[in-house]
C-alpha cells in the first residue's frame, strides 16, 4: 500500500478471499474497479473489510442451517444465493403436511430414485391433484416410463398389485387408467376394446383345452397389460391349431351371411374380415392388442391372410371398392355380402377339370356349379403371390390358365422361330414369367407359343450372361454390352435411370461399369492392366542354352519431345536424320547400327529411336519391350517432363537398365544437378550421389561426352551378358510396317534370336510371306541378318501390326494355316467392334440425328496409324462421334475415294501419297482429302471439324449499365429518364431492371430517345429516355442492365 492506495489483489490476500469474490463485493458497494490490479482508497478498503466480515458471518450461519459442505472460496456468493432458497423449504414442508401421496404411491418408487431430495419433493407437487384422477395423472405416468423404455413390460407386470391397492375408491376404473397411461397410443381404441370383451369369454371354450387355459390367462392380464407383445403371443398360439384345422373354418364362413347377430358377429366375422382387419391390426400394432386382446379376431388371421391376398387377385377391379369400404369400418355387417361377391368370381381357378376347350356357355355353367364349393376350395388361391396387378383381370381365363402351365413345361424342347422384335420384351418379363404364365394362355395357341418362345429366349440370355467379368480399364457402352452379354440399350437405360445420359460410343470409367454390373447382378472384377512394355515371351529358349553366343546390345533412346533424342543419335551416327523428319519431330521408330571401338575391339550397338510425342505411347512401350538398355534423354534446361516419366515407367516395367543422358549442357540455362534431383523422385539416383544409375552429361550438338556415353552403354551390356543362338531359325519383333506403292508390304524386323536369310518363310502376326529381300538401315541389301540386327523385309502378303512377333517356319503349309487363323480372328474382332446393330440405330433415332464425322485414315506406317487412332479416341464424343471407316497403312487409292463418296467421309492422309488416278477421282467425286505430315496439325484439324458439327451455344454478352434518375408520366404509361453509367444502351436490346439488388423485370428495350429524337444507341456519360411497352413501374434509382445474346462456338476438351 502506497500513498493511501490499496490494490484489490493485496486486499484479497489480507481477507483470504478470491479476487472474483472481492470484485463482487465492490460491485455491491458501488466501488468502481476494473480488475484485480485496480487501486482503491483506504476508506473504500475499510468498507470492503466490513462487508466481507458480515458476509463471512452470514455464510457460517447459512452453512449450519443447510448442513452442506462447500468450498471456502465459493461461500460468500453461495451465502447470498441461499437466502431466497429458504422459502422453497417452507413450501416443501407445507406439501408434506397434507400427505396426498396415497393415490400416487405408484409414483413413489419412481420419485425416490432421484438423487436430490429437493427435486423429488418438487416433483411430488403435481401428484397432489391426482384425486380427481383425470388430468395430472396422465402427464405424470407416461413421464416415468419414457426414460427406461425397455422396462415397460416389467413395469406393467408390477403395476397390477399397485392397482389392487388403489382399487378402494374406484375398483373398476383404476386398472384401466394404469393400463392406458403407460402406452399413450392405446388410449383412443378403448371403446373398441370394450365391445369385443363380451364375446371373448364365449369363443375360447369352443376351442381346444389349451386355448381355454390361454384365454383365462388373457382375461387376468387383459386390462392391465395393453402392450403389443402379449396379445400378439396369444394370437400366434391360437393360430397354430386353426391352420391345422381348416375344415372348421369352412362351415363357419358359410354361416356368416345368415347369422349376423351383433354379439356373435365378432367371432364369426373373423373369417371373412381378415382382408380389411389385417391391415389395420398390422398398421397400428400398439392399439390392436387393446382391441383384440381377447384373441377372437386374430385367431383366423393366418389363413385369412392368404385369403385376403387372394381376394383382390382373383376378382375384377370393381371389388376393390368393396375392400376399401371394408377397411373403413371394421365390424360393419353389410360389408360381408360384398365379400361373398368378391369370392364368387375366383372359384373357376380351382375347377381344373379338362374343360379348357369347351365353349364359353359351358364355362359359365361350370362357374355356377362351382359357386357351391367356393368355401371348400378357397385355400387354392393361397398359391398365388402378391402380384395383384398381373392377375386383376383373370376372370374368364382361369381354367385354361392352369392347363397352360403344363403346356409350358412340355413345350420348351420345341421352340418356334424367334422374333427379334420380342427380345426387349423378354428381358422385361423376366420376373413375372413363372407366375404370370397362366395369364397369357387365354384362348389361342399362338399366344402360348409366343410366351413359350419368350421364356426360351430369356433362358438363353440368362445362360449366356456371365456371373463374373474381369476388366482392365474403361470400356465403351458397346464394348461393355459385349462383355456383359446384354443389349447396349439396357446399359444406356440403367445409367439414364441413375441420372447419367450416355451414348453408345462413350467411354465408361471403372466405377460406372461396376455400378452397371451391380444392377445386372454381375460381379465386376478390376485387374490392373499389364504394362505394355512388359516382355511377353522369352526369345531364347531352353534348347538354345548350349549354342549361345554374345550379341550386340539393342539400345532404345527415350525421352520427352524436343529433348534432343534424334539429334543425339545423329551425332553418334554422324548423319542428319533429324533434318529429314517432318516438323523436326520423330514419328517412327528408327533402327540404326553404330560401330564402336571399345578396348581395341570393334563392337556394334543397335539403336532404336522412339518418338517423344504423347500420341506415340505404344511405340515407346514397344521400343522398351524389345530393348536391352534404355537411354533416357533429359534436357538440362527443361528437366523431367510427362513423357520422361512415362519412359521411365516403360523401362522399369520391361525390367531393362536405364542410362540417363543429360543433354543440352551447352545451353545457358542448363542445370544438370537439378535434373539429377528431379530424377531421384522416380527411383533414379546418380552414381556420384550414391545410387546405381549411370548419368552422363552430354551435348548432342557439340558432340561432348558421347564417347563416355557409348562406353557406359557397352559396360552395362557386358554386365547383362547378352546372348543368342545364331544357328537356329529367326524369331523377333516387328518394329514398324508400312505399305510401299512400289515394294508392297514392308516391315522393319528386329531379330532377337536366330538368323534370318533371304528365302525364309515367316509369319508376322496375321501376315504370311517369303523373304525376297532385306535392306539394312543405310539402304544396303543384305542376305543374312544375325541377332540384334534390324532390317527391312520385302515379300509379306499383308502389312503386319507394329509390335507383332514373327517366326520363321520350315513348313509353308503350317505357316499359311497359322496366318489364316490369325487373320480370321482379327477380322471377326474388327467386325464386332464396327458393327451397327438395330438397337444402336434405334437409340440414335431416339436421340435425334446423331452427328458423326466419318473418317478414312491412311498412314505411311502401321505405328503412325495406331498412334493417330489412339489420340482420336481421347477426344470426347458425347455429342459428336468419330466413325473410323478404315484405318490402315498405304497410299490413298481409288477404292478409298469410292468408299468416302458413298459414306460421306473425309480422307486423312498422313505422310502418304496418292495412287495413280486417285487424286483425279477425288476431284470428280468431291471427296475432301486432307494431307498431313505432322500429327499435331492433324489432331487440331479433326478437333476443329468436330467442334464445327456442334450446335453453337447462346451466350449473354453485357452491353452496359444505366441508372434511372427521373420518371415522367406519358399518357397511360411512364418514361424513365436515365443516365448511362457504363457501356452503352442499344434500342431493341434485352434489358434487366434491378431494384434493390433484385430483378423485377426482364424484357426488350422498345423505345430509346435522346433529346426527344429516336436514338439507335446511347453511350456512357449521356442521358436518355427509356420506354417499355410492358413495364411502366419505374422508380428513381432503378438500374437497367442491357445485354445481348450472341452465338459462341462450342469447344471440345481432350480427355486424359
UniProtKB/Swiss-Prot annotation:
Biased composition (Polar residues): 109-120, 151-173
tr-type G domain mapped to chain residues: 550-723
Region of interest: Disordered: 60-88, 109-359, 406-472
Keyword Cytoplasm: yes
Region (G2): 584-588
CDD domains cross-referenced by the UniProt entry: IF2_eIF5B, IF2_mtIF2_II, mtIF2_IVc
Annotated segments matching region G5: 699-701
Main location: cytoplasm
Residue ranges of the region described as G3: 609-612
Listed SUPFAM superfamilies: Initiation factor IF2/eIF5b, domain 3, P-loop containing nucleoside triphosphate hydrolases, Translation proteins
Residue ranges of the region described as G4: 663-666
Biased composition (Low complexity): 208-220, 260-272
InterPro entries: EF-G-like_DII, IF2_II, IF2_N, P-loop_NTPase, Small_GTP-bd, T_Tr_GTP-bd_dom, TF_IF2_bacterial-like, TIF_IF2
Location of the protein in the cell: Cytoplasm
GO cellular component terms attached to this protein's record: cytosol
Ranges in a coiled coil: none
Biological function: One of the essential components for the initiation of protein synthesis. Protects formylmethionyl-tRNA from spontaneous hydrolysis and promotes its binding to the 30S ribosomal subunits. Also involved in the hydrolysis of GTP during the formation of the 70S ribosomal complex.
Family: Belongs to the TRAFAC class translation factor GTPase superfamily. Classic translation factor GTPase family. IF-2 subfamily.
Protein name listed in UniProt: Translation initiation factor IF-2
Organism of provenance: Nostoc punctiforme (strain ATCC 29133 / PCC 73102)
